[in-house]
Structures are given as structure tokens and as C-alpha cells.
Amino acid sequence: MKEVMDLILLFDVGNTNITIGLSDGTHIVQTYRLNTEVTKTADEYYIQMKSLFDYKRITSVAISSVVPRITEKLKEISEKYLKLEPLLVGPGIKTGLNVKTDNPREVGADLICAAVAVEDLSNPMLVVDLGTAIKYIYIKHKTILGVIITPGVNISIKALVGNTALLPDIDIEVPKKVLGTNTISCMQSGVTYGVASQVDGLIERIGEETKESFEVILTGGLSELIAPLCKHELTRDPDLVLKGLLKIFNRNDTLRK
């Protein structure tokens, strides 16, 4: 009989999506993506997730969240249905990172997890998380040295549509040419090539300020779309935050037992 593997349930909660990871303790073995819906109840989320994977295999839960109302629902699912106390990334959790910002407590859980995921790499790293907001996290010697936050693609589209009379809502696609020839392709160019140019430009400015070379990793929901448009050399890892969350869980698991 094939042995059933125990799994760690990982949640990366963003303002637009909830990325769910299942881990064997070493690797991310499966991922799922749900919409972030603050009006949905814990029971509704549980029913939705129960259709995706077998809850009986879950032995631990870890949550990285920037949406407090969703955090509470996931805690309720963990405690009510799984009878497990989840690990929440936040104050008091051992991350292994130094955070050299004016107020380290205001650095989001997603940024912490992304930084932890690359902390062991020898070179300085710039993580670009293309989510609801675009975050640039500069890490060196297991230390976050600085962060940049800009509006994400969806926020930019909503701002255009919501603050103009004639611009329509659009699907996020890369147009065939940079110079658009109709309203939709013009807007699509702005939010795709525009973000790629922002990434390239900030890479150059960070290099000028730090006066050192560094590696760049793109992650987040739109990284697959934007990465090919960037001119600088970079890599892409869509599971970076989940990998960092898994490392934080393993780092704290022995302390919780």
C-alpha cells in the first residue's frame, strides 16, 4: 500500500489572490489560487478548499497575510476544522532576518517571506513581487536594506477607468506593438510595457545607489506576463513567497513543540 504523505498547508494571502501551497516539509508539491473575497465566510472558504485537496493529510498550517479579515477566516478554518493552531508570520516569529527600516514592524509578511526565500544566496538580491502593489525588496547578508512600493497593474487599470469618463476596463494582455493604435491596445501597452520599463528603470537606479551588482528575481501573479518584457537579466519564481513561508515554518516548528 502506498504511504500517504503528511502535508503542511501554506497560505500566501494578498489583496487580490490567495495562493495556497501544499508542502512535504522540504518542497512545494502543489499550488492553488483563489480570489481574495473578504465577504466570503470561513465555512464558504473551507468548502471551496475541500474540493481542491484532502484535508485529512494536513498536519500543520502556516499563514502569511496582508489582509487581516482573511487571516481571521483562515485561522478559524485551521482551528475549527483541522484542530490545528496555525503559525502566523508577524511580530514574535523567528525569521532569521535583520530588517534595517525605520519601523521593521510595518514590513509586510509577504515581503518578509520573499526575503527569507533568497536569504541564503551569496549575492545581493532584488526581489520584485508583481502583485496588487509592486514591491521591490533589496536583500544582502540576510538583511532587508530597503523597499520600494508602487501601484500594481490592476490598481493602475482601476485608477484609469475610475477617474476618466471614456476609458474602458480592459483585460491584461501584452499588445503586439508598444505604440497602441486603439484605446484598448494603448492602455494594455501602458500597463504591461510600462511596468516592465519601471522594473528596468528601478533596477538601474538601485544599482546606481548601492554601487554593487545584484541578482533580480520576479515573483507574483503577473510575473509570467511581465518578465519577458524586461530588458535586464532576471529569473522568475512564482512560488517564492510560499518557499519563504515554508522556511519560516520550519524555523519555528521546533520552538512551538
PLM region descriptions:
Residues 32-36, 175-215, 222, 233-235:
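Adenine-nucleotide phosphate-binding core of ATP-dependent small-molecule kinases
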Residues 1-9, 13-95:
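N-terminal glycine/serine-rich phosphate-binding loop of ATP-dependent small-molecule kinases
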